[in-house]
Amino acid sequence: MKLCERLRELRQERGLRLKDIAGAAQISVPYLSDLERGRTNPSLETLQSLASTYGITVHDLLEGVEFYGDQTAGALPQGLADLIADPALGAQLTPDWIRTLARIELRGKRPRDKQDWFEIYLHLKRILD
């Protein structure tokens, strides 16, 4: 399932309209419509806001979403999503850190798993904080 399909499914299974979710998530109806049609990709803040609106975690929101290579259609790399969802490790990450980590790529390669992402976070935190 693509992220756009997952977003539509979450809304429809609750019997809600686009404007209901958009208002609660503080995004525009056209933007939510574009997300549900796969026309645009959400920011981390939007994913967090939508997850909160649905009463679930970002990890739960991404559950069942297909990943292409190491990136899902419009979301975070799988290993980074796993790190965010980890109750102990993910709690340390602020939205700024998540945005920073999500941009890490060198020659088309990214960290592979939760542990790789966490090690990079620790190294950057030690240097930058």
Swiss-Prot record:
InterPro entries named among the record's database cross-references: Bact_TransReg_Diox, Cro/C1-type_HTH, Lambda_DNA-bd_dom_sf
Posttranslational mods: Cleaved between Leu-106 and Arg-107 by the IrrE metalloprotease after exposure to radiation. Cleavage inactivates DdrOP3, leading to derepression of the target genes.
Pfam families for this protein: HTH_3 (PF01381)
Domain HTH cro/C1-type: 7-61
Residue ranges of DNA binding: 18-37
Any one Gene Ontology molecular-function term assigned to this protein's record: DNA-binding transcription factor activity
Species per Swiss-Prot/TrEMBL record: Deinococcus deserti (strain DSM 17065 / CIP 109153 / LMG 22923 / VCD115)
Function in brief: Repressor specific for genes preceded by a radiation/desiccation response motif (RDRM) site, which is present upstream of several radiation-induced genes.
Keyword tags: DNA-binding, Plasmid, Repressor, Stress response, Transcription, Transcription regulation
Descriptive protein name: HTH-type transcriptional regulator DdrOP3
Site (Cleavage): L106, R107
